[in-house]
């Protein structure tokens, strides 16, 4: 049974020390696509965290009964089943957001973070630790998404969660929104900036040269 210290390390590690986007550079495609609004970034974070946590839990519970030759198929079946559940819940209770997220919820099935944690961690670790690892990686993924979404929506549209924060010139205010921040390439540069900041603070994350 894992003690509280181990659980805390597993939960907090992926947020900064081993962030799936900033350090491992996984899940970047969805991070570019769903961060033009803070609302979609938050919902995507919740969706991926739920899938990652519960897929880790179920795969860990089944790990001693899965033949090595079909383990990837079993993992994808578990993940796909959870993604379908999450997608149906979103369409039932948050239809407008589900439409904005489009295919990206479905693509959680092939998300490198979810697949990677299932194969590298859940297949070798007890259920509770695996569950907490899934939550930690989901929060780490979400921390980057929400940071990028905050900057893009605030300075690209002058709002947060659809509520106007910076009064726009077109409405008689003072702020001219930067439309470039609403384009996907801007997310790429913002993520790069976050990675640079994190690696400046934690230089041990910088890859060795040569």
From Swiss-Prot:
One of its GO terms (molecular function) is oxidoreductase activity, acting on NAD(P)H, quinone or similar compound as acceptor. It is found in: Cell inner membrane. The chain crosses the membrane at residues 14-34, 42-62, 72-92, 103-123, 131-151, 178-198. It is a multi-pass membrane protein. Keywords: Cell inner membrane, Cell membrane, Ion transport, Membrane, NAD, Sodium, Sodium transport, Translocase, Transmembrane, Transmembrane helix, Transport, Ubiquinone. Its EC number is 7.2.1.1. One of its GO terms (cellular component) is plasma membrane. InterPro entries: NqrD, NqrDE/RnfAE. It comes from the Bacteria. It is an enzyme of class 7 (translocase). It catalyses: a ubiquinone + n Na(+)(in) + NADH + H(+) = a ubiquinol + n Na(+)(out) + NAD(+). GO terms for biological process: sodium ion transport. NQR complex catalyzes the reduction of ubiquinone-1 to ubiquinol by two successive reactions, coupled with the transport of Na(+) ions from the cytoplasm to the periplasm. NqrA to NqrE are probably involved in the second step, the conversion of ubisemiquinone to ubiquinol. Belongs to the NqrDE/RnfAE family. Composed of six subunits; NqrA, NqrB, NqrC, NqrD, NqrE and NqrF. This is Na(+)-translocating NADH-quinone reductase subunit D.
